[in-house]
Amino acid sequence: MKVIDLIRNSKSTAFSFEILPPLKGNSIQKVYNVIDKLKEFDPKYINITSHHSEFVYKTLPDGSFQKVNIRKRPGSVAIASAIQNKYGIPAVPHIICKGFTKDETEYALIDLNFLGVNNLLILRGDIKTLEASQQNPELYHDHATDSQ
């Protein structure tokens, strides 16, 4: 069901919550443990935040540094699908247009459609930390409305 319809048709205040994907190396079970504790409150939907990659500096064997682009957390696509399939609660993954290239955004939307995740929250994302989108603006959407 579409979250907008759940909100529109609700006779009382609806409860929802937001999940921060676990750091890489953790399993989906960490997310399930949180949801298991909160599902008694009958959430109408669950938001899944999304975090863009960030640059870190890796020390090379010769003592020099290399700038590396890494993601510390899994994306919201897989987590949204896992939550929706396990619990039957609509999932709302966040898609940040400044954190992903236009192609990455398109692929995420194709995957979400394929997985039956129909609710999205599309955001611009933080500008100050997104060096890549500033260096290659033609590859990124400037605003969420550009994703349409």
What spans do the regions from the language model cover?
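Glycine-rich anion/phosphate-binding loops
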Residues: 26-32, 97-114
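Hydrophobic faces of well-ordered beta-strands that scaffold small-molecule active sites
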Residues: 13-21, 44-48, 91-95, 120-122
